[in-house]
Design a protein with these regions (language model features):
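Conserved micro-motifs of the catalytic ATP-binding
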Residues: 1-3, 39-44
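A conserved beta-strand-to-alpha-helix junction within the catalytic ATP-binding
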Residues: 3-19
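Short conserved segments within the C-terminal catalytic ATPase subdomain
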Residues: 21-33
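Short helix-loop "hinge" at the ATP-lid/N-box region of the Bergerat-fold HATPase_c
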Residues: 60-61
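Short conserved segment of the HATPase_c
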Residues: 93-105
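Short alpha-helical Gxxx[C/S/T] motif in the catalytic ATP-binding
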Residues: 120, 124
């Protein structure tokens, strides 16, 4: 059931969990940043927010080389949207039209990543939309990685 939740501690907790695993496993550091506020309220479902962030971090981690860095950034825009960005140092997207990566069963992974369903980003997109949000994928300007940006209406 949807209710007013502060997503800051939820996202911070997912980042902490992932840091404790992947700092050791792949020497990947996930930096959590915010714009100095303590509260980012949305109408949402706590475990669905966890699921979204975990899924996006899983993707970022699988495309980031050993020793790489991932940034999770949360901020409030001038038009009162809460924005969550996950910025990695992976290979970015080959697709000119990045919206297609959110399609069901779509996959752009090299074979070395093994089997996967192609459902992860589609599920994330559905969860974001359930929260009246939007998700956009883009490449970092220097072509060194990807940016996943989610925006939610704030409460």
């Amino acid at each position: 059931k949807m209710k007013k939740i502060n997503i800051e501690p939820i996202i911070q907790s997912v980042v902490d969990d992932y840091n404790s695993i992947y700092k050791v496993k792949k020497y990947i550091k996930i930096n959590y940043e915010n714009d100095g506020k303590k509260e980012y309220f949305i109408n949402g479902i706590e475990n669905r927010i966890e699921q979204m962030i975990a899924n996006l971090l899983d993707n970022s981690i699988s495309f980031t080389e050993k020793g790489g860095k991932i940034i999770v950034n949360i901020s409030i825009t001038s038009n009162r949207k809460i924005t969550v960005k996950i910025i990695d140092e992976g290979q970015g997207f080959k697709e000119k039209d990045t919206s297609k990566i959110f399609r069901r069963f779509y996959s752009n992974r090299p074979d070395k990543f093994g089997e996967h369903s192609g459902l992860g980003l589609n599920i994330v997109k559905n969860l974001v939309e359930l929260h009246d949000g939007k998700i956009v994928a883009s490449n970092r300007p220097n072509n060194k990685g990807a940016i996943m940006e989610i925006s939610f209406p704030s409460m």
